[in-house]
């Protein structure tokens, strides 16, 4: 049951992190009459622009996080990013607050060490070979054991920040410094992973709902330096490999528990499925579902956490391509007229208050009976957007 926003009977969602994914979640939640509060570390973040109200705090500060939650008393606490004091969330959960999907899932998935040990050591899922290192010397030893090339990532980071590929011994120190710079201020530990020459990688959006677990069609994607660049749906998979992917996704999401959508990232090599990462929230590669599915990943997430039925059917093949800034500027302006002329394509601008070089500022979405054509149109439209 939901009430009326801004009245005493309102159903309240408090969103921790107010980026472009959270913005879409709030839009979908508001369609059901949910009162939405957005929280982030800076003013005028995308989700704040559509929320009923917002707060600006350091979400890694447990005291500040507790204060805003106790003030708002939300029915649902919905993390949208990883840079949150998850120990405080676990405490609040024991006091009766509802964290989506669970506080433990939020804590595990913000920590590459925790989720990798869960996947490989507890659940027996196939992963890349890995080791952890807390110093430059430990990193050198780990690289020697894993072999070159290998991938290094901070255990606490997101969107490819701090991730690099070591291609020779000369890269080790540079990769170590880069990883430390992106570690969200929580330690210096890194994970060193075997470099897998996979055939392709997918995101399998997995919805845990009151009606059971449901899977969206696989989303193929390309990342550059660990950051989302383009995605398309559906990505073709043979039935046995798809079944393996769904089995793996169900194992990891069942262990994490709760309701909502999970972005399960998988590598596929010779029809074998290899676990990479999981996010207990909508996934950036899943933005393509805004034009491909009957319900986008954001509507699915909102419905699932509210206990409502979901539909994961695909309507059209389609693609998404990021719109990135090439400048540094407050309150940027966008020339979108030419981009809007591209056939069967839509432009979605996030409304970020500052443009930075390489920052995602929007996406171009395209549909077509031919995935290749959809990808071409999305890329064309994205590159026609002029940010100035």
From Swiss-Prot:
- Write the record's keywords in alphabetical order, separated by commas: ATP-binding, Ligase, Magnesium, Metal-binding, Nucleotide-binding, Purine biosynthesis
Q: What is its EC number?
A: 6.3.1.21
Picking any one GO molecular function of the record gives: magnesium ion binding
Top-rank taxon of the source lineage equals Archaea
Catalytic function, reaction form: N(1)-(5-phospho-beta-D-ribosyl)glycinamide + formate + ATP = N(2)-formyl-N(1)-(5-phospho-beta-D-ribosyl)glycinamide + ADP + phosphate + H(+)
**Residues reported to bind Mg(2+):** 265, 277
The residues that hold N(1)-(5-phospho-beta-D-ribosyl)glycinamide are 20-21, 80, 284, 352, 359-360
Spell out the GO cellular component terms annotated for this protein, sorted alphabetically and separated by semicolons: cytosol
Q: In which pathway does it act?
A: Purine metabolism; IMP biosynthesis via de novo pathway; N(2)-formyl-N(1)-(5-phospho-D-ribosyl)glycinamide from N(1)-(5-phospho-D-ribosyl)glycinamide (formate route): step 1/1
The residues that hold ATP are 112, 153, 158-163, 193-196, 201
Give the enzyme class.
ligase
SUPFAM superfamilies named in the record: Glutathione synthetase ATP-binding domain-like, PreATP-grasp domain, Rudiment single hybrid motif
What the entry lists under Pfam families is as follows: ATP-grasp, PurT_C, RS_preATP-grasp-like
Name all ATP-grasp domain ranges: 117-306
The keyword ATP-binding is annotated on this UniProt entry: yes
Segment forming the signal sequence: none
Task: Tell me the GO BP annotations in alphabetical order.
Answer: 'de novo' IMP biosynthetic process
Q: What does this protein do?
A: Involved in the de novo purine biosynthesis. Catalyzes the transfer of formate to 5-phospho-ribosyl-glycinamide (GAR), producing 5-phospho-ribosyl-N-formylglycinamide (FGAR). Formate is provided by PurU via hydrolysis of 10-formyl-tetrahydrofolate.
The protein's matches in PANTHER family, at most eight in alphabetical order, are given as: FORMATE-DEPENDENT PHOSPHORIBOSYLGLYCINAMIDE FORMYLTRANSFERASE
Would you identify the family this protein belongs to, as annotated?
Belongs to the PurK/PurT family.
Quaternary structure?
Homodimer.
Q: What protein does this entry describe?
A: Formate-dependent phosphoribosylglycinamide formyltransferase
**Native species:** Methanococcus maripaludis (strain C7 / ATCC BAA-1331)
């Amino acid at each position: 049951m939901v009430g009326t926003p801004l009245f005493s009977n309102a159903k309240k969602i408090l969103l921790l992190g107010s980026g472009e994914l959270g913005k879409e979640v709030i839009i979908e939640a508001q369609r059901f009459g949910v009162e939405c509060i957005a929280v982030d570390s800076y003013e005028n973040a995308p989700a704040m622009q559509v929320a009923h109200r917002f707060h600006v705090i350091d979400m890694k500060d447990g005291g500040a996080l507790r204060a805003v939650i106790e003030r708002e008393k939300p029915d649902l606490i919905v993390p949208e990013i990883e840079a949150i004091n998850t120990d405080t969330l676990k405490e609040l959960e024991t006091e009766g607050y509802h964290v989506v999907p669970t506080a433990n899932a939020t804590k595990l998935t913000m920590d590459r060490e925790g989720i990798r040990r869960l996947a490989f050591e507890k659940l027996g899922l196939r992963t890349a070979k890995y080791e952890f290192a807390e110093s430059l010397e430990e990193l050198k030893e780990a690289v020697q054991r894993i072999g070159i090339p290998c991938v290094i990532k901070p255990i606490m980071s997101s969107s490819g920040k701090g991730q690099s590929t070591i291609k020779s011994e000369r890269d080790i120190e540079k990769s170590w410094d880069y990883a430390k710079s992106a570690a969200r201020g929580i330690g210096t530990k890194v994970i060193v992973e075997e470099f897998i020459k996979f055939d392709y990688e997918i995101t399998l959006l997995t919805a845990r709902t009151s009606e059971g677990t449901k899977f969206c069609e696989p989303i193929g994607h390309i990342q550059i330096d660990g950051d989302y660049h383009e995605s398309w749906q559906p990505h073709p998979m043979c039935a046995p490999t798809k079944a393996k992917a769904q089995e793996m996704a169900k194992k990891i999401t069942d262990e994490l528990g709760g309701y909502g959508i999970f972005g399960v990232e998988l590598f596929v090599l010779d029809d074998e499925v290899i676990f990479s990462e999981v996010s207990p929230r909508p996934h950036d590669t899943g933005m393509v579902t805004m034009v491909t599915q009957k319900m986008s990943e954001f509507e699915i997430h909102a419905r699932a956490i509210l206990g409502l039925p979901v539909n994961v059917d695909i309507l059209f093949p389609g693609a998404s391509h990021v719109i990135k800034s090439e400048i540094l500027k407050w309150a940027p302006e966008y020339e979108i007229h030419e981009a809007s002329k591209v056939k069967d394509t839509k432009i979605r601008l996030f409304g970020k208050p500052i443009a930075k070089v390489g920052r995602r500022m929007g996406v171009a979405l395209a549909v077509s009976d031919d995935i290749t054509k959809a990808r071409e149109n999305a890329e064309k439209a994205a590159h026609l957007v002029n940010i100035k």
